[in-house]
Structure formats: structure tokens, C-alpha cells
Amino acid sequence: METGRSRGGGAAVSERGGGARAGVCGRQEQAGALAADMDSHCECAAETPAAEPPSGKINKAAFKLFKKRKSGGTMPSIFGVKNKGDGKSSGPTGMVRSRTHDGLAEVLVLEGSKKEEPPGGSDHSGARPIPGPPKPSGPGLGSLASSSVAKSHSFFSLLKKNGRSETGKGDHAEASKAGGKQKRGLKGIFSSMRWHRRDKRGKEEEEKAVRAAGPGNLVLPGSLTASLECVKEEPPRAARRPDSPGQDASRHAAGEPAGGEQAPASAESAPERICLEAGSPTGSGDQSSRGEDAEGHRREEKPGAALESGAGEVQAAEDASKTGDVPIKTVPLVDSEGGSGRASAVPDPSSVDPPSDPSADRICLMFSDVTSLKSFDSLTGCGDIIADPEEEAGPSCDKHVPGPGKPVLSKKNASVVAYQGGGEEMASPDQVDDTYLPEFWDMLSQTEDQGQGTQEGAAKAATASDIKLAPETSSDTRCGEAAKDMSSVKRRRLHRIPIESQQKEEPKHPEKEHQEGVPNSDEGYWDSTTPGPEEESISNSSSSKKVVIPRDSDSGDALCDLYVEPEASPATLPATEDPPCLSRLKPVSPGTITCPLRTPGSLLKDSKIPISIKHLSNLPSSHPVVHQQPARSEVPRTKIPVSKVLVRRVSNRGLAGTTIRAAACHDSAKKL
């Protein structure tokens, strides 16, 4: 029935086509004439399918191709609007609706053929043999495969030719197509979409190779193909996420460069790939092989643009699919991770090394701060207190240990400048206590034994041991020897200090008056980190006074006697060897050490020890200074916070002899 109607309608159409085509020959490009021809076909086809009227409207704008293609899709109402707009706006180019680049090529070729066909009225007879293929395709349209064929490029061209020839065969194809449309449901639509893409691969990919770059693919397909692309692109995306990156690369490289249709083609296989993946763990390999096969077919079908635009990409995709891009992508990931790992690995050794270096650096800075304060009238009042008496005695100790002492002085002169004021706290002996007190006490025990055997052997150990064995007498003799040895250097620094020492000695008479103001003066010096030279000299005198009083109270009368004896000599002979001895004797007393060390506030922490042993606590904290230099040379990396406990032990040990020994050691350290 439908075929008879379509044939009858085809006869009527042919009759109309006789006159209409004659008039249309001149104005084929105009959408009105085409709409008239399409209306005739629409009437014939609209008799059977209820969905034909919207498709008929589309056909007016799209040369029946939209109608048939629309009939191929059971969603004419939805996409019909898009097709209507596209077809009407595009007119004869409405055929461009095909999402693929082939659609563009087909539009150009078909339009050219249209122009050629209508002028020759004999084209109808010539076109009739052409629709012969549509007949087999027509029954095929009834099935899902037929719908895909209808959407195929060749069938589109045949449909266009049939529509133009308006032969009964073309109408019959339309009728059969309409019947197929009615049979198809949503399942048929989706299946036709998938099949259409698969079939189109071979047919349209040839023209796609020519039209490799077609940004309007998605725009053109406003029909089911567009929706199919959208629908299928989404599942492939989901599939791409679980799929190996190799598959993604193969899809992008092989599918996209060739054209938008290849990607959908791969998208069609994507759902199957997903199923395969879910079914078997080797689904990824199967997918990659399929991608390769599809790509292989695509390559064969795409001799031109595929080789030009995506040959390298396709090869890369094949390699990716064969080798699996998982390792490839993972390789950059591994590289990035490896780089980060390398970076992390690098910081690890660097973090390990710097602590060791900073420990030595901190030691150097600590020595430099102490020595710089000693050798230089540091801007800090405390530094001034330490500096003047120790500058005199410092050179002798420096000569005994010129290697570590002098370079430290040179290094830390600059550092002292940076650490003026609070810098002293930075290099306070607390840090030294944390790191070197254990070693220092060990060194003290060793140096006592060694000092007895070799007082002059190991410079630092000898000086410390001599002072420890006989804090009073050895300090005098030691000062004399050091003064003789370093008379020249002493004189140089003595020239710097004689005036200051005299000033110190002069105000020493009213020492008792300054005794009460000692702590306040220390605080004042600490607060004013940069006193003027006059202030420095005054502070030196006051500091010497301060030193004298604690010596009397803490270290005993012997130290006071020693200290009182030098008072006369330095005033008389500042540049002679005696003043250095006196100055050295001064630092020997713990008072000199305690005053400057108290000010930094680091020793305040050590002041936890009972007041009677404050000097001991201060001295052990300063003792590490003595052995810090040798520690730098011997064991620069010693991080032992237990040193504070050792300081407490020292306080428990607290004996007058030990205090004097510690004072002597600290003096030697300051000299260094």
C-alpha cells in the first residue's frame, strides 16, 4: 500500500517535475523552488508517516535529504526544529547539516551535480539507474543497518539525486524509509546512530580526509548526528577516564585530527570498549587493538588529509595504543614525580649538611663574637667590658693558638658588626653550652692531665691546664710567658688599650661605689648597644670595677690580691709586658667573665645555678668558648643539648679551684 501510494505520488511528482523542474532549472539555488519540489515529495511520504510533516518542512530547506535523514531518525520533532532552521538558513547548503566534514564536501559536490542535473532533463532517466542502489538501501533503511546506510554519504548523494530526479523509485525509497522510520523506536534511533557512525567511517572518512579540518561539524549536524555526538562523546569521555591514556591518545590522535567524525566513531566503539573493560581486564588491550584496527581502516580510507594532518598523530596513537600510553603518560608523571623526588632528595642531604655546617658556623660566629668583643671595642657595652682587658691578654693566647684564634677574629670582626647588640645573644655561650659543654668538660679533664705534662704543647689545652693547675701562680707565669712571646702584638693592642686600662684603674679606687650600680650599669650597656668611644672607655672602667668586686666576693682574696697588684703596674707601664699580664689576670678572675656574659641574657639562663656558683655557671658556659675553637677544628659537629646538665654538674662540683680553672680557660678562649 505504501509503496503503491509512493509510486503513485512519484508519478504525480514526475508530472509536476516536468514543468516545475523546467522552471527550477534556472533558480535551483533558490530555496522556494526546492521547497516546492520537496513539498511534492513530502505529500507522498506524509501520507504514511505521521512524523513526515515536520520532516517535509525540513526537506523543503534540505532537499529531501533532511527528510530522509530525519526519517532515518525517529526524533524529527526534536531535531526537526534545528534542521528546519539550518536547512532554511543554509538553503541548498542545508545539506551541510551532516556533522562530518564529508557533509560539506557532499554539499559542494551534490550542489554542483544538482546544477548539472537539472539543466539536463534527461538526468531523470540517468538518475533512475542511480536510485537502483537506493532500493537495496531502501529495504535496508527499514532495518537499523538501512538507517545507517541512509545516513551514509553515498546514500545521501543518491537520495539527493533521487529527490531531484523525482522518480517513483526515489519516492518508493522514501516510502520504505518512512516505513522503516515508523518501525524504529528510541532503540532504533540509538542503534542507527551507532551503526550510522560505523558505516560512515568508511564512506565519509574518504571525504573527511579531504575535509580534515571542519570546525562546523557539530554545528552542521543539528540533526540526530549532533545529538549522537553529544550523547556518544559523553560516554567515551567516561570511558576515556577509566581507559588507559594510550586509548585516549589514540582516540585524540587518530580520531580528532582526521575529523570530528572519527572521534564519534571512536566514541561509538567507546561504549563497547567500556563493556569490554568491565567484562575483562584485558579490555584495554582489546580497545587499543580495535582503535588500531579502526585507525588502520581510517588510514586506508584517508589517503590525503589523514596522512597530511594526522599521519604522525595516528602513528603516535598506534604506538601509544600498542605500547600503551599508560607508561608514556606515567613516564612524564614519573619524571615530574622524579623531579619532585629529586628535589626532595636534594633538600634532604642539604638539610642534613646545613645543620652540620651551621653548627660550625655558629661556633665560629660565637667565637667571633666573643673574640671580636675582646679584640674590638664592640659597640655593645658588654663587649666593651670584655674587650679591653682581654685585648691585652688576647694577643698572647692568640699567639699560642694563632691558627684558630686569628682567623676566627678576622671572620667574626664582620660578623660582630652584624651582631652588634642582640647579636651577642645570638652567639651567646648558651648555644655553646648546648653543643660543647660535654666535650668541654672532657677536654678539661684531658687538658688537666695533658697540661701537667705539656703546658706549652697544645696551645689552648696547655694554657687552660696551666691555669687550672695553679690558677693564681700559673696565671702570673703564663701571663709573663705570653706577654714575652706576644710582646709585639700585645704592644699593638696595648697601645689601643693603655689609656682605657689606666682609666679603668683610676676609677677602680671607688669600686665600692660602682658595685651597687653594677647590675644597673650592665643593663644600661645592654640597652644602649652602641655607646660612644668615651662611653666605651667609661664602661670599660666601670666594667673593670664590676669585675673587681665579684672577684673579691666570689673567687676569693687571692684573686683580689692578684688583681690589686696589677693596678700599680698598668698605670706605670701600659705598654710593658706587665700590663698584659695584669689584664690577663683580670680576665682570669671569674668576675670579668661574668659581667659581660651576664649582659647578653644567655648567661641569665645559666644563672639558675645558686648565686655562690653563678660564676661557675657562667664560666662553664664560657668554657665551651675555650674549647669551641678546638672543637671546630676537632669535632665541628656536636649537637648535645645535655651540656646544660653538665653545667649543673659543674656547679655541684663547684670548687674554688674549679672556678679559677674555668675562669682561666674562659680567659684563654676570649684571648683566642
UniProtKB/Swiss-Prot annotation:
Q: Which Pfam families match?
A: AMER
Top-rank taxon: Eukaryota
> InterPro entries, from UniProt?
AMER (IPR019003)
Q: Which GO terms describe its biological process?
A: ectoderm development; negative regulation of canonical Wnt signaling pathway; Wnt signaling pathway
Biased composition (Gly residues) is annotated at: 1-21
Feature: compositional bias, Basic and acidic residues: 163-175, 201-210, 230-254, 289-303, 478-488, 502-516
Where in this protein does the record put region Disordered? 1-23, 74-360, 443-560
Membrane topology field: Peripheral membrane protein
Its localization reads: Cell membrane
| GO terms for MF | phosphatidylinositol-4,5-bisphosphate binding
Q: Where is the composition biased (Low complexity)?
A: 142-158, 255-269, 343-354, 446-457
What are the UniProt keywords, alphabetically? Answer: Cell membrane, Lipid-binding, Membrane, Phosphoprotein, Wnt signaling pathway
Residues annotated as carrying Phosphoserine in the record are 154, 223, 227, 244, 284, 356, 359
**Transmembrane region positions?**
none
Recorded GO CC terms = plasma membrane
In the record, the note on similarity to other proteins reads: Belongs to the Amer family.
Q: How does it assemble?
A: Interacts with APC.
Q: What does this protein do?
A: Negative regulator of the canonical Wnt signaling pathway involved in neuroectodermal patterning. Acts by specifically binding phosphatidylinositol 4,5-bisphosphate (PtdIns(4,5)P2), translocating to the cell membrane and interacting with key regulators of the canonical Wnt signaling pathway, such as components of the beta-catenin destruction complex.
Name of the protein this chain belongs to: APC membrane recruitment protein 2
- Report the source organism: Mus musculus (Mouse)
What gene makes this protein? Amer2
